[in-house]
Regions:
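Structural microenvironment flanking redox-active thiols in thiol-disulfide oxidoreductases
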Residues: 105-149, 159-165
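Positively charged n-region of N-terminal signal peptides that target proteins for export
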Residues: 1-4
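A short beta-strand-turn-helix
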Residues: 70-92, 115-118
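Thiol/disulfide oxidoreductase modules built on the thioredoxin-like
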Residues: 90, 145-153, 157-202
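Hydrophobic membrane-insertion alpha-helices, especially the h-region
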Residues: 8-21
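Proline-centered helix-kink/hinge sites
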Residues: 69, 102-103, 109-113, 154, ...
C-alpha cells in the first residue's frame, strides 16, 4: 500500500510540474529540430513543384497562398525597423531562430551564403530571434551573438513570441519564404533542404 501511495504521489507531482512548465509558454512548447526528412518534390531541372496544399516543404501554389502576418515590433539589429509592406517586390526569407539553438547555428552558413548571393537580386532575409531562455531575451546578448556569428542581414527580437505565434511556428529553426506579393509560399522546420530552399528562392525571384 505504501508503495502504491508513493507511486501515486510521484505521478501527481509529474503532472503538476508539467502544468507549471506548460504555463511558462503561451504557445506550443518549442523544440530544436535536427535535419528533417525532405518532403518536397524536385524535378530534373531543379524546380520544386508547386502544390495547392498549405503544407511544409512544398512550394505552395500562388492562388492558395495566404498573406504573411506582420512582423511584430522588437529591437532591430543591422537594420532600421522594417515592415513587410515595404518589401513588396522582393522575396523575403524569415528565419525563426535563437542564438542558443545548436540546430539554428548549423543553418547560418547557408543563410549567409543565400544573403550574399541573392540580396542584390531581390532577396531579403530577416532573422526573427525568438528566445528559449532568459539570457537570450537580453538585447546586449543578442547583439553580441549576431556580431560574433557574422550575421549581416536584419535581425529582430521576438521576446513575447508575437511573430512566432502569428506564423504558427512550433520549433527552432523554422524558415518561411514569402513571394514578392508578401504571401507565404514555403515553410520548413529544422535543418536541411538547403537546395530546395534555394530553388524556391530562384523560382519566386523569377515570378
Amino acid at each position: 500500500m505504501k508503495g502504491k501511495l508513493l507511486m501515486a504521489g510521484g505521478i501527481a507531482f509529474v503532472l503538476v510540474a508539467g502544468l507549471v512548465d506548460a504555463a511558462r509558454w503561451p504557445r506550443p512548447y518549442p523544440v530544436s529540430l535536427s535535419t528533417a526528412k525532405p518532403a518536397s518534390q524536385t524535378s530534373d531541372d531543379g524546380h520544386v513543384a508547386a502544390r495547392p496544399e498549405t503544407k511544409n516543404d512544398i512550394l505552395i501554389d500562388a492562388q492558395n497562398a495566404r498573406p504573411a502576418p506582420a512582423i511584430a515590433s522588437g529591437e532591430w539589429i543591422n537594420s532600421e525597423p522594417v515592415k513587410l509592406e515595404a518589401l513588396r517586390g522582393r522575396v523575403v526569407l524569415v528565419d525563426f531562430w535563437t542564438f542558443g539553438c545548436y540546430n539554428c547555428r548549423n543553418t547560418l552558413p547557408t543563410l549567409k551564403r543565400l544573403d550574399s548571393a541573392y540580396r542584390k537580386r531581390g532577396l531579403t532575409i530577416i532573422g526573427v530571434h525568438s528566445p528559449e531562455f532568459d539570457r537570450e531575451k537580453r538585447i546586449e546578448n543578442v547583439r553580441r551573438e549576431v556580431g560574433s556569428l557574422g550575421i549581416d542581414y536584419a535581425v529582430v527580437t521576438d521576446n513575447d513570441y508575437e511573430t512566432w505565434r502569428a506564423y504558427g511556428v512550433e520549433a527552432w529553426p523554422t524558415v518561411v519564404i514569402l513571394d514578392k506579393r508578401g504571401r507565404v509560399r514555403f515553410m520548413h522546420i529544422g535543418e536541411g533542404l538547403y537546395d530546395e530552399q534555394e530553388s524556391v528562392i530562384k523560382q519566386l525571384l523569377a515570378e
